[in-house]
Amino acid sequence: AERNVVLQKAQNDRATAMQAIEELNASSAQVSAMLKERQAARAAAAAAAAAAAQTSAGQGQGASDNWVQGTGQLGWPVSGEITSPYGYRVHPIWGTTIYHSGIDIGVDEGTPVHAADGGVVVWSGWMGGYGYAVVIDHGNGLSTLYGHNSELAVDEGQSVAKGQVISYAGST
């Protein structure tokens, strides 16, 4: 009987873990789709601006969409130990291989989180498996996601500078 209880608990734990993985994968797909849409809009605006510039023979300014180009040199958002590295990893209990598309850095709750580079905030809010999250588009197809925050310090559409406080660490 005790064995059945332990087995049932293990099965429930596995189901919970698999649900969390599915939620993170869905959130990741949501971020990817949002960034692709933003890149397509940026390309269309750039093409329209180039066409307008040709017809006006260089008079006036091209279109802008609150773009901030990052440097491409990412800084660390927080100072701490990497608790979960990028890439494939084996779940410590179930032995299943899962892909981790980022890194987790262990810090105390409330630690200020800094933008790794300049850019535009394209998401600031609750994002499923990432909890309270911020996504920054740095341009040239580069973006960063900062998840599991206790508090957010920036709004969607806001331009941010490298090193600017964007959130505070949590465990959401």
Explain the meaning of each model-derived region.
Residues 68-172:
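Catalytic cores of peptidoglycan-degrading enzymes
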Residues 1-67:
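Alpha-helical oligomerization segments with coiled-coil/rod-like character
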